[in-house]
A protein has these predicted regions:
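Catalytic phosphate/metal-binding cores of nucleic-acid and nucleotide-processing enzymes, i.e., regions
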Residues: 1-112
């Protein structure tokens, strides 16, 4: 498979996961959640918007352990860029199951 096709396939997989995450968050929270469509730009503010004062980063990695370690750190800088109080990462697991992943500090911020 050529490199361009591989990158496009990964982007499509990520876009689909972001749409799924936005739909799920809308359903469970009652907030109108949407994709930001601004991934990778300087001053990135996360993948999903709609939950007040919260930044959401989405990951759909084959290696979910890597996603659980990497994404909570990345979303923290996005939280700062957005000047939001809260940040969380949503990781898609095989079979379409989702988990919200936080650092201990991010979890504590939710408790305050």
């Amino acid at each position: 498979m050529c490199e361009g096709r591989k990158l496009n396939k990964q982007k499509n997989k990520g876009d689909k996961a972001e749409r799924e995450a936005a739909e799920l968050l809308t359903k469970v929270t009652g907030f109108e959640c949407k994709r930001t469509l601004a991934a990778g730009i300087p001053d990135d503010v996360g993948d999903i918007v709609g939950i007040p004062d919260c930044v959401i980063q989405v990951a759909n990695y084959k290696d979910t352990s890597t996603a659980c370690l990497k994404k909570p750190r990345e979303v923290e800088s996005q939280r700062e860029n957005a000047k939001a109080k809260y940040a969380a990462s949503m990781v898609r697991w095989r079979g379409g199951n989702w988990r919200v992943v936080l650092t201990v500090e991010q979890f504590n911020r939710f408790l305050q």
